[in-house]
């Protein structure tokens, strides 16, 4: 007597369980990791999504919760495991795991705690997905992207930090609020360190190609009567404010990471301000990672756009570089 499945379905081709072609792994199922996972699922970017964490109950619960929504998604396979074998053959590995930033704590204070976590994560990622692109989200992201690059042995174009993609998004949102224009039509770049010492490039701020600095030569300076400098100040303070109000940030960074994942997985060659090794650029002489406009595709970072920065902007970038290098050279890994 055949079973019901055999009565219902006639098998034509034996399923050989071919490996996923567009697999994405998210390491860490905290608030940020799950916001990344959900945003990626809503964009239909992967044919397999793998979740990894050290807390097995939460990990299984998050996986099951997503699986139960499969009817509403277009990602056929969602898996999880504490063992990194579940991540095998990933095209993109997104690292969100790490100690959470506390209220009032600077991103740089998190460093050594998260370095120790990376010493376990990165070798396991490399073991099972030696050809993957690494996208680091954990804070302080610029230092930890450097750490991931050093530990992984990957070429620099395949180790990317989410960097100022979110800072620039916040900047464009706040700019739009001030002008009454949607953020997508407001153009401006925040570069350098993700966070406290990020650098707004005021000369590039425009709407429909109209430079705001042409209309207001004092834009972003202390002499600016419209106080546009406050917009960047809000960008810097916004994460701290959200953490104070709800305990952590999640949705905006999740959407930002999915935006980067889309460009990489679809080989779109869009330009994003992401953290990459900037040695040799803008007078930087050390192995530091900072955000500059990068062309992204399925090989990672293929090109860097050479921005025309003012002397004071370059000086701020170099100061960020010096600060980060001062921290990096003291790290133990």
Swiss-Prot record:
Primary location class: cytoplasm
Catalytic reactions on record: (S)-lactate + NAD(+) = pyruvate + NADH + H(+)
Subcellular location: Cytoplasm
One family name in Pfam for this protein: Ldh_1_C
Record keywords, A-Z: Cytoplasm, NAD, Oxidoreductase
First-level EC class: oxidoreductase
EC number from the UniProt entry: 1.1.1.27
Single annotated GO MF: L-lactate dehydrogenase activity
Pathway: Fermentation; pyruvate fermentation to lactate; (S)-lactate from pyruvate: step 1/1
Active-site annotation: 194
GO biological process: lactate metabolic process
Protein name as catalogued: L-lactate dehydrogenase A chain
Source organism per UniProt: Ambystoma mexicanum
Name of the gene this protein is made from: LDHA
């Amino acid at each position: 007597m055949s079973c019901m499945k055999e009565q219902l379905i006639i098998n034509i081709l034996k399923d050989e369980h071919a490996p996923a072609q567009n697999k994405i792994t998210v390491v860490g199922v905290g608030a940020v990791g799950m916001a990344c996972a959900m945003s990626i699922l809503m964009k239909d970017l992967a044919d397999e999504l793998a979740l990894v964490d050290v807390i097995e109950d939460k990990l299984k619960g998050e996986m099951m919760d997503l699986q139960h929504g499969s009817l509403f998604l277009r990602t056929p396979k969602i898996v999880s495991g504490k063992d990194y074998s579940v991540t095998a053959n990933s095209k993109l590995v997104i690292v969100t795991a790490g100690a959470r930033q506390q209220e009032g704590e600077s991103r740089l204070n998190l460093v050594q705690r998260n370095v120790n976590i990376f010493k376990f994560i990165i070798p396991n990622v490399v073991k099972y997905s030696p050809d993957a692109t690494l996208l680091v989200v954990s804070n302080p992201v610029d230092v930890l992207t450097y750490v991931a690059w050093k530990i992984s042995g990957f070429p620099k174009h395949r180790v990317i930090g989410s960097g100022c993609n979110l800072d620039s998004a916040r900047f464009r949102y706040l700019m739009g609020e001030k002008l009454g224009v949607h953020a997508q039509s407001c153009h401006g770049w925040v570069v350098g360190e993700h966070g406290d010492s990020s650098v707004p490039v005021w000369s590039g701020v425009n709407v429909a190609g109209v430079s705001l600095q042409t209309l207001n030569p004092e834009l972003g300076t202390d002499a600016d009567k419209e106080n546009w400098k406050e917009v960047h100040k809000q960008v810097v303070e916004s994460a701290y404010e959200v953490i104070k109000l709800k305990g952590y940030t999640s949705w905006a960074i999740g959407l930002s990471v999915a935006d980067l994942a889309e460009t990489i997985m679809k080989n779109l060659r869009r330009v994003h301000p992401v953290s990459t090794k900037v040695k040799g650029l803008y007078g930087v002489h050390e192995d530091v990672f900072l955000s500059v406009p990068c062309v992204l595709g399925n090989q990672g970072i293929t090109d860097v756009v050479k921005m025309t920065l003012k002397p004071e902007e370059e000086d701020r970038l170099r100061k960020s570089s010096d600060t980060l290098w001062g921290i990096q050279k003291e790290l133990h890994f």
